[in-house]
Amino acid sequence: MYDQVTLGLNVDPFILSALKEDITSEDVSTNSVMPDSTPGVVDLICKEDGIICGLQVFERVFTLLDPSTRAEFYVKDGDHVENKQLVGKIYGDIRVLLCGERTALNYLQRMSGIATYTSQVAALLEGTGIKLLDTRKTTPNNRIFEKYSVRVGGGNNHRYNLSDGVLLKDNHIGAAGSVAKAVQMAKEYAPFVRKIEVEVENLDMVKEAVEAGADIIMLDNMTTEQLKESIDYIAGRAEIEVSGNVTKENIARLTGLGVNYVSSGALTHSAPIMDLSMKNLHPVE
């Protein structure tokens, strides 16, 4: 789980990799029109309503290129912003502002998009007592940014990586031979402080998971009727998570059923970006 402090401690290798992807040897466009260092300033402008997220990462792109670059933000992560709003100003060598522009905006747009979409989904669960969770369906090498964005948007992080908890999915069950066998083996291997979660797809698997002593049962890709039947059978003997193609458009059907958690891969794999841009770049004395 990452907050602004731990995010700042871990992002540099990923940002440097992104910069190296975009600036292999030089920025030939910038160097052709700006051969010498010239101080400048540029506006960061929001082009649609949403939740801003990733300002620290945005600024870090530029300070990795030149530590003297500085940003002046008028909002903070988690704030609601509106179309045409001035979010901040960035001061530094014009060559640095131009070289880092696309990489910095890519992070900010992606992170703000995830935070915005998550906030919209979380609003649909407000007052229900259901926790909204993300998944590991993230962009490779961007998980730290995407899971942080989910939290900023009002969601909660499920496992960050495979070391964080036991989640026995269909292929684990297939490898073990049965739900009961998979749960038994996990209980024998995992430390006693770790909860055992198992993914099930039908009532027979639900029954097996309950009898095996699973701590959390994930009801995957079930119809509303199957969910009701499964929840009635579990009857409080395990925590309940619902998953499987959960989106902003269909999550409302899961309220009022008595589930503890709803996980949605859409928070990270289907959130549209939020449109932001850097405008009005000009030299300063």
Spell out what each predicted region is.
Residues P272-L281:
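Structured adenosyl-cofactor binding patch, chiefly the S-adenosyl-L-methionine
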Residues G236-I240, L281-E285:
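Short acidic, glycine/proline-enriched helix-loop-strand junctions
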Residues V259, A266-L267, N280-V284:
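Acidic, glycine-rich flexible loop/linker segments
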Residues N221, G244, G265-A266:
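Short secondary-structure boundary segments
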Residues K248:
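Cys/His-rich Zn2+-binding cysteine-cluster or related metal-binding knuckle/ribbon modules and their
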